[in-house]
């Protein structure tokens, strides 16, 4: 299998530490969400940013492959850190809230959203491992 892209991130100090990527594009302090001070991020925010960007890229690609123009997709991804009744440690769940402009029917938009969910590498990586709420809004 050919690798299309590879990146590395290094963390020192865990949830009360620092993380940076090998190219230094990300170079931030990390704190638990409960201790957020506005100057640090947390793993959940980083996951939300990556997943939202990846999913929206997949959604935009699927729309373009189906010759849908001017839909201007927007994706907001909510990551929740929840109690896990089956384990001592918490678990993640996500809500993917997508918006597209009213240039296609709700039915077609939902099909393309589902196609994006099948295509997105983050969705593939998490499929069957976390709860995902997939929501769509067609706006004027």
Swiss-Prot record:
Domain of life from the UniProt record: Bacteria
Cysteines joined through disulfide linkages: none
Any one GO BP annotation for this protein: response to oxidative stress
Pfam families xref list: OsmC
Residue ranges of coiled coil: none
Signal peptide range: none
Protein family according to the UniProt entry: Belongs to the OsmC/Ohr family.
NCBIfam families reported in the protein's UniProt record: organ_hyd_perox
Protein name from the UniProt record: Organic hydroperoxide resistance protein-like
Native species: Staphylococcus haemolyticus (strain JCSC1435)
Organism lineage: Bacteria, Bacillati, Bacillota, Bacilli, Bacillales
């Amino acid at each position: 299998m050919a690798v299309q892209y590879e990146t590395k991130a290094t963390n020192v100090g865990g949830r009360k530490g620092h993380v940076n990527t090998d190219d230094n594009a990300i170079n931030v302090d990390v704190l638990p969400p409960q201790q957020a001070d506005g100057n640090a991020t947390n793993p959940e925010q980083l996951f939300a940013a990556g997943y939202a960007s990846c999913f929206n890229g997949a959604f935009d690609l699927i729309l373009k492959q189906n010759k849908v123009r001017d839909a201007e997709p927007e994706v907001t991804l909510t990551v929740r850190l929840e109690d896990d009744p089956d384990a001592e440690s918490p678990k993640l769940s996500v809500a993917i809230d997508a918006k597209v402009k009213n240039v296609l029917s709700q039915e077609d938009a939902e099909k393309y959203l589902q196609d994006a969910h099948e295509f997105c590498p983050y969705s593939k990586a998490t499929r069957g491992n976390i709860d995902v709420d997939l929501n769509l809004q067609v706006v004027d």
